[in-house]
Amino acid sequence: MKRILLSTLLAATLFPASAHTHGNNPATKLEQATALTPETFRIRDPFVLVDKKKKCYYIITTAQTESRHRALRAYRSTDLEHWYDAGLVYDSSHDALACVDTEQDVWWAPDTYRYKGRYYTFVTSSAEANGIPRFTTALCSDKGPLGPYHAMHDNISQIPLTPDGVQCIDGSLFVDNDGTPWIVYTKEWNGPEVQNKVGEAWAQRLTKKLDGKVGDPIFLFRADEAPWVPGFKDGGHVVDAPFIWRDKQSGRLVMLWSSFTTGDVYAVGQLTSETGTIRGPWKHEPRPVFVNGGHQMLFHDLDGNLKMSLHYDNNDGHLRILDVEIADGILRVTTPSYSSADKSR
């Protein structure tokens, strides 16, 4: 799938590293006077972290430093409408990811979580010069959501949380009812490990510290199982951004993911676990829950309302945060201005 690193371009052009936090110093203040709004915030794969203590929200995006090393940049908001640059929160030049090449290797899809009192950003990368294909790893911050984040191993070969030697992207964190952490990820559709260019979703159990793998991965689903994903004309069924959420009211386990529906339009779909566990089996909903955008996640805002964040559309991605509800285990977009959601159902 064609990906445009808009967040990196934005950081490099509008917010040069020289004007902000250097190295691994934590970002402690808002340094951008003019707020970005959903209409002006050009970003892909936006993941919203809620800070109840400080009553604000963060989005951490990909960026790069003056020395052209991979980095992460944070944005902060108190209302989900106005986003202020909070500076760099990670600089790869200081750790095992220093070998990630700005031109050759990917740097995608940072998802940030609070887990056991620490903050972790799951990010997709690669280290082709070291023979390591695309993978997802976790960076850790002991000091708060604004970092500094750091890799949890000194050796690049120990960094991937997805299976070694397998082309994987878009890992997200899921913690099941007994406290077991999992990384839910995509075995990429154009990688050598899949059949007939059909992407797959898998899950890998992690250590309690999120710094390694435990046991063998488990298969979740294939993209061509979904009725709403016809595949590209020249072949290929995409799985992007698998994200698992437990609905507290129904107790059901739902999974959102992104792919391309009729007309090669990016969209969000849903599955439900028939056992209520990550092992499934997973049942597809026949139609997408959102069309013309994707790489979604769910969160409760500071008032307890359920929201879905994604980029809209897929060609010129901007931040979009939608009101959603889950009724009888099925997610539905309730934002009044979005009529296509109702039409798709």
Language-model features: locations:
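Sec-dependent N-terminal signal peptides
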Residues: 4-13
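C-terminal segment of classical bacterial N-terminal signal peptides
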Residues: 14-18
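Carbohydrate-active catalytic/glycan-binding domains of CAZyme proteins
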Residues: 20-345
